[in-house]
């Protein structure tokens, strides 16, 4: 059989056309050393800082150090699966996490993978974990309140949407309790249909015990608060790299709400452990240590995170992201490195004192050194009307109280002021997991400031408050409704309230 040259050419052309020549170029390096969650890699010449690399076992790493002859990466997972000599691939991607409403009600790890056993998360959108904070023009001033449901905070240290308010105190003083109460208190707004009233909550557990996180999840489920809450967990047993990236991942999840005209609240519990995780990574990467062995950029670590909380302008959809970072102090030392850093970044702080806590003043807020630098603009008028003088009265009471320890015979005016102060302290006490609606808080504080409690024995103040609120809910609901709707105490409402209280005090004292 004789083949014609033209036929041969046609066959060859067909075969060439069918050849799949889509070859992929991969940049591959090798692990030189591995240990303590850090891998030194040789051969990735074009890798970028912050890029994700993939090890042979499928474990991911995050490049943080670019050196002359090698690259330092933190391993996001089990470093036992990475061995010396393993190949490492560039992915040419930066870290991304799933965002959106599909995450609500779920517990995820620092990379956004579900860890609650409820199946996959059907999220359509992903965001980078490191996003630039909004610029000056894109923001507007804080003007709407975030109601925590805690009398001592909503009246004296008000928090606004888009604010960053630090909760600081020793261990076991009730820092997490304030945060959890604030989440539970948003349930009331979520029962309404108006989207602008709702605040979606994100709780980030950094370096905590797994049992503590499980307890918080259970508490939120029991209170029906998980429907609008997302929990990001990077517990103490997880890699330092995951504890380091958890707040940034959670912040990106919160920014989804902020940038889509909704409102979100994010709680970082706590940034002391976050700084410790970052210090561990930095020292293992052989970066030079500074004060308290923290690296030089530990301020930037927290500032770039907290600057992402903002109240957006109308042109940008008027959304907001409010941040409540938590810092744990050692023996009340607020002047340590990390506490002073975070105090200077935030818009105020709620300082919790162990001494007050042990005295039974709970929440143990030290009103003297707690401030809210921007929140008063967000406080509703009714609260301003009743709470304006409370801070001063409490400060005077503390001063007179310490003074009265030395002098036994006090003049009647001083004694009356001390008694009034003690009753104010009592009225600001509150049980855990029992947030109050703002209109009920206003009535309670009105009772305290207008001296209706003068005839009530101090040990019966809580009983008086409980009975008074029960009575007003049942028989004088119009007073509460008026305060809630008008957002101020009108003359008519005040007359009704005065008449009700005078009557109630007489009955109670009898």
Curated annotation (Swiss-Prot):
It catalyses: ATP + H2O + 4 H(+)(in) = ADP + phosphate + 5 H(+)(out). Produces ATP from ADP in the presence of a proton gradient across the membrane. The alpha chain is a regulatory subunit. This is ATP synthase subunit alpha. The gene is atpA. The record marks 370 as: Required for activity. Keywords: ATP synthesis, ATP-binding, Cell inner membrane, Cell membrane, CF(1), Hydrogen ion transport, Ion transport, Membrane, Nucleotide-binding, Translocase, Transport. ATP binds at residues 169-176. Belongs to the ATPase alpha/beta chains family. One of its GO terms (molecular function) is ATP binding. It is a peripheral membrane protein. The keyword Protein biosynthesis does not apply. The lineage of its organism: Bacteria, Pseudomonadati, Pseudomonadota, Alphaproteobacteria, Rickettsiales. F-type ATPases have 2 components, CF(1) - the catalytic core - and CF(0) - the membrane proton channel. CF(1) has five subunits: alpha(3), beta(3), gamma(1), delta(1), epsilon(1). CF(0) has three main subunits: a(1), b(2) and c(9-12). The alpha and beta chains form an alternating ring which encloses part of the gamma chain. CF(1) is attached to CF(0) by a central stalk formed by the gamma and epsilon chains, while a peripheral stalk is formed by the delta and b chains. Its EC number is 7.1.2.2. InterPro entries: ATP_synth_asu-like_sf, ATP_synth_asu_C, ATP_synth_asu_C_sf, ATP_synth_F1_a_nt-bd_dom, ATP_synth_F1_asu, ATPase_a/bsu_AS, ATPase_F1/V1/A1_a/bsu_N, ATPase_F1/V1/A1_a/bsu_N_sf. One of its GO terms (cellular component) is plasma membrane. It is found in: Cell inner membrane. It comes from Rickettsia massiliae (strain Mtu5). CDD domains: ATP-synt_F1_alpha_C, ATP-synt_F1_alpha_N, F1-ATPase_alpha_CD.
């Amino acid at each position: 059989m004789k083949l014609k040259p033209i036929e041969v050419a046609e066959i060859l052309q067909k075969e060439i056309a069918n050849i799949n020549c889509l070859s992929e170029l991969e940049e591959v390096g090798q692990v030189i050393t591995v240990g303590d969650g850090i891998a030194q890699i040789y051969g990735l010449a074009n890798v970028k800082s912050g890029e994700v690399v993939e090890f042979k076992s499928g474990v991911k790493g995050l490049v943080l150090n670019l050196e002359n002859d090698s690259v330092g990466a933190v391993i996001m997972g089990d470093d036992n699966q990475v061995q010396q000599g393993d190949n490492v691939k560039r992915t040419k991607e930066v870290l991304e996490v799933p965002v959106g409403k599909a995450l609500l009600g779920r517990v995820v790890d620092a990379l956004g993978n579900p860890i609650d056993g409820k199946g996959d998360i059907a999220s359509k959108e992903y965001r980078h974990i490191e996003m630039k904070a909004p610029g000056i023009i894109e923001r507007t001033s804080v003007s709407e309140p975030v109601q925590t449901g805690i009398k001592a905070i909503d009246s004296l240290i008000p928090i606004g949407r888009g604010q960053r308010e630090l909760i600081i105190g020793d261990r076991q003083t009730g820092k997490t309790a304030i945060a959890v109460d604030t989440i539970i208190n948003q349930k009331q707004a979520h029962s309404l249909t108006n989207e602008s009233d709702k605040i979606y909550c994100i709780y980030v557990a950094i370096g905590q015990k797994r049992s503590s996180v499980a307890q918080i999840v259970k508490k939120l489920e029991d209170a029906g608060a998980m429907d609008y809450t997302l929990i990001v967990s990077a517990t103490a047993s997880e890699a330092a790299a995951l504890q380091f990236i958890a707040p940034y991942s959670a912040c990106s999840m919160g920014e989804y709400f902020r940038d889509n005209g909704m409102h979100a609240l994010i709680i970082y519990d706590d940034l002391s452990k976050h700084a410790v995780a970052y210090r561990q990574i930095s020292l293992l990467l052989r970066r030079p240590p500074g004060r308290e062995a923290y690296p030089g950029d530990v301020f930037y670590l927290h500032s770039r995170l907290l600057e992402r909380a903002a109240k957006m302008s109308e042109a940008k959809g008027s959304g907001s992201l409010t941040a409540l970072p938590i810092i744990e102090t050692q023996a009340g030392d607020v002047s340590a490195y990390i506490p002073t850093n975070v105090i200077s970044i935030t818009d105020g702080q709620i300082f919790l004192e162990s001494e007050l806590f042990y005295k039974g003043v709970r929440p143990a807020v030290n009103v003297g050194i707690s401030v809210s630098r921007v929140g008063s603009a967000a406080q509703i008028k009714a609260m301003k009307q009743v709470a304006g003088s409370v801070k001063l009265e409490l400060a005077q009471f503390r001063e007179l109280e310490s003074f009265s320890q030395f002098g036994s015979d006090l003049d009647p005016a001083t004694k009356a002021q001390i008694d009034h102060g003690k009753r104010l302290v009592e009225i600001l006490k509150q049980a855990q997991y029992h947030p109050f609606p703002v209109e009920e808080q206003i009535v309670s504080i009105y009772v305290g400031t207008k001296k209706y409690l003068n005839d009530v024995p101090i040990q019966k103040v809580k009983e008086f408050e409980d009975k008074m609120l029960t009575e007003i809910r049942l028989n004088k609901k119009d007073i509460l409704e008026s305060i809630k709707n008008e957002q101020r105490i009108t003359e008519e409402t005040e007359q009704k309230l005065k008449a009700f209280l005078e009557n109630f005090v007489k009955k109670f004292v009898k």
